[in-house]
Amino acid sequence: MNYTSYILAFQLCVILCSSGCNCQAMFFKEIENLKEYFNASNPDVSDGGSLFVDILKKWREESDKTIIQSQIVSFYLKLFDNFKDNQIIQRSMDTIKEDMLGKFLNSSTSKREDFLKLIQIPVNDLQVQRKAINELIKVMNDLSPRSNLRKRKRSQNLFRGRRASK
């Protein structure tokens, strides 16, 4: 790379970093708006300990943490849904919701659609309850470690086969 290329690369980095900082600053501003609206900075908010932080600290393994995070994200989406008609905080909630889903689902549109679909399933609907019970055995089988072990062995065999062929 010549001198001009270095300068152009540096300028690109500066532009990208500053736009990221700007987005981050906007994100924090929206959280501050919500804190102010909900009066969440008062000392009495900490009474009884944290809701999520202590739980998140306990889980280190990525798969375990993802399960906990999915429940937390689901909680926030339900919270935001309860205040969807509040024009004072609507923009803040929308901004945070988009950022949260983007980070949690790695900006995957299909994961986002499926996640939102799952959290909106009405638990009190009799037809939904019947379908859920009907699918329970398949869900339990999918959760079982044995099926994951089989998948892992299959992928290891594929990897070994590729390595041996080289």
Curated annotation (Swiss-Prot):
Claim: Cell division is one of the keywords in the record: no
The primary location reported for this protein is secreted
Q: Does the keyword Signal apply?
A: yes
Name any Gene Ontology BP term: macrophage activation involved in immune response
- Expression tissues: Released primarily from activated T lymphocytes.
Among InterPro entries, the record links this protein to: 4_helix_cytokine-like_core (IPR009079), Interferon_gamma (IPR002069)
For this UniProt entry, what's an example GO CC term? Answer: extracellular space
Pfam families named among the record's database cross-references: IFN-gamma
In which domain of life is the source organism classified?
Eukaryota
Q: Which residues form the signal peptide?
A: 1-23
Q: Where are the transmembrane segments?
A: none
Q: Where in the cell is it found?
A: Secreted
Question: Pyrrolidone carboxylic acid modification sites?
Answer: 24
Residues the record marks as carrying a glycan: 39, 106
Tell me which UniProt keywords the record has, alphabetically.
Antiviral defense, Cytokine, Glycoprotein, Growth regulation, Pyrrolidone carboxylic acid, Secreted, Signal
| Entry GO MF terms | cytokine activity; type II interferon receptor binding
Provide the family line.
Answer: Belongs to the type II (or gamma) interferon family.
Subunit details: Homodimer. Interacts with IFNGR1 (via extracellular domain); this interaction promotes IFNGR1 dimerization.
| Function summary | Type II interferon produced by immune cells such as T-cells and NK cells that plays crucial roles in antimicrobial, antiviral, and antitumor responses by activating effector immune cells and enhancing antigen presentation. Primarily signals through the JAK-STAT pathway after interaction with its receptor IFNGR1 to affect gene regulation. Upon IFNG binding, IFNGR1 intracellular domain opens out to allow association of downstream signaling components JAK2, JAK1 and STAT1, leading to STAT1 activation, nuclear translocation and transcription of IFNG-regulated genes.
Q: Which PANTHER family match?
A: INTERFERON GAMMA
> This chain belongs to which protein, by name?
Interferon gamma
User: Gene for this protein?
Assistant: IFNG
